[in-house]
Amino acid sequence: GVFLTHGHADAVGALPYFLQNIDAPVFGSKLTIALAKYYVESSNIVKGFEDYHEVTENTEIDFPTATVKFFKTTHTIPDSLAIVIKTSEGNIVYTGDFKFDQSAAVEYQTNFGRIADVGEDYVLALLSDSSDAESTVENVSDRKVAETMLETFLNAEGRIIVACVASNILRIQQVINAAYESGRKIFLTGSELEEIVNIALSLNKLTVPDKELIVNFNQMKKLADDELVILETGNAGEPIKALQKMALGRHRQVNLHEGDLVYIATTPSVAMETQIARTKDLIYRADAEVFEMANSKKSSGHATPNDLKLMMNLLQPTFFIPVQGEYRSLLAHAELANELGIPYKNIFIPGKG
């Protein structure tokens, strides 16, 4: 079977290509399965696949030689799960994307008790998210991010264009809340964003305090600049290219003008620094302003070193395999594991592919 940890495009986007070659059941939480179905159906690569199975952290799936279990993790999308494969030799744990946030909302909370229970049951191997293993700055709570966002929205005099990843449900919820509390309406650009928002709303994973808060294109054009938030996620959930089009006057719905504030609410992907710098330059040339969240608050969806060490201390694995990240991130994670007493001979850094 295929076991999914969460519903972000980078976690489920390859599914249609996989299912094109291998017919296997797909398991995931309710929101994860709903988003997986959306990506598979919209790809037009696989037709008629329906072998989906919803799980919770209390689900146990028995196979002849192993049992698959789960525990809740904190990420920037609800219903995120880590995967535990219980074998006769011990547990094998794959964290998926995760971080720890002690102040997380209920939908995003980590089940620390369950993690400790898995650790007590002996962990043979841990495969853990290495994306932010090199970070020298720890994440702040997302509650602090929400406070900063609201303050920015209240002080902005013109339109606010928020750039974030399409499936970052947590950030979208924060934008919805800040727009409502600052007396603004929201316009969603693009069909992918609308579809993801509708899926999350239908499953009560996203809440809108006023049914008239989200407006269509014609309604947007009638609003004053200080009454509007535009949420831009771009194609394939990548907003930076879309911001460049807005700045150059080439966007099909919204172009930048004087008085606009572009709020970059996404943590740049690895190797995107040059693109971000060029984009900011184009925005300023269009007489707009830029607020980059990453410059004031560190809040990625990935565990920083202290979180990574806490996960290892809770699980106490015999073998450690850092996954997800550039080689230098994997190496940094391996060094953290060694600091905690895991010998290098028990640490394996995999190659890609």
Question: Which functions belong to the PLM regions below?
Answer:
Residues 1-3, 8-222, 241-255, 274-277:
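His/Asp/Glu-rich metal-coordinating catalytic cores
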Residues 176-177, 181, 200-353:
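C-terminal regulatory/interaction regions
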